[in-house]
Amino acid sequence: MLDNKLYSDIPPTKLRNVKEVFTEASNDPFWVWMCDQYMFRMVENNFHALRIKNKNNFEKRNKNYANIIYAPHSNWWDGQVGYNLCRRIFNIKIRMMIEELNRFPILSKAGAFSINKQSAQESMKALKYAVEMLEDPEIGLWIFPQGIIRPPNYRPIEFQTGMTYIAQNCVKKYGGINLIPIALNYAFLRESIPEVFVEVGEPIVLEDTSVARKDLTERLERHFTQLCDRQMIDIYTGNLREYEVFFQAKLPWWKRLEHRLKRIDKPKID
């Protein structure tokens, strides 16, 4: 039973019952630069390291098509980690679908656009807008297909149909789309602050228009669950050899002192 104080099946826009005006994404160079600095430093200042596995899987995509990059959504940091991945590692233009964007309007100048789940008509407006943006193969749409925040490693993983709607309409309109799954987790290892773990799954290049939406959604759920389960086992068993350290924070002064003290020779005891 989920704790309703922490998690709810009701989307925030419905829960707060506040009308949200649809906001399109823009790509203002100044605000993109500002957002880069903010997002980069926020992650680097709050995590000991970011480790990434199978980074080169991203290069296996069909570069003639745009990209839908999808991940689990368990906490506030997921969007910031996604921003760092798209901008610093994948080097693409990011677009993010954000509920309650009216509370953070400045993000729209760096690639975010709003979705209002108060009604199906309002939600559809955002989905159609996403399809229009994905004409550009240099764009990556970062999305959380579960559609709502869930507890860490929550099972079963169930997708809402928004992502498959976007993907199938991109296939009809542009001939194809890359679906790139990202397993995302956070864990304390041997330091005082947590580390971020990212595994890039094999891209699914969707070009078939005949697959039913329900069948495609279930296929993507199974594939994504396998990826996330594998990552969870790797972390729990300490099997981290294949993870590349993308960044690692400098040790705080008291940790550096601790390491120096450990190197001091102990006096011999007769």
Residue ranges and their predicted role:
Residues L2-V18, L127-D270:
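Non-catalytic C-terminal accessory region of glycerolipid acyltransferases
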Residues H48, A120-M124, Q160:
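A conditional alpha-helix N-cap/helix-loop micro-motif detector
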Residues T23-F47, N102-G111, Q248-D270:
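Alpha-helical membrane-targeting segments
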Residues W33-H73:
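Helix-to-loop junction immediately C-terminal to a conserved catalytic motif
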Residues N57-E59, L101-R103, S119, Y186-F188, ...:
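Residue-level detector of flexible, active-site-proximal loop/helix-junction positions
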Residues P11-T13, V32, M39-E44, D78, ...:
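Catalytic cores of transferase enzymes with a strong primary signal for eukaryotic protein kinases
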Residues R61-Q121:
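Catalytic core of membrane glycerolipid acyltransferases/transacylases, capturing the structured
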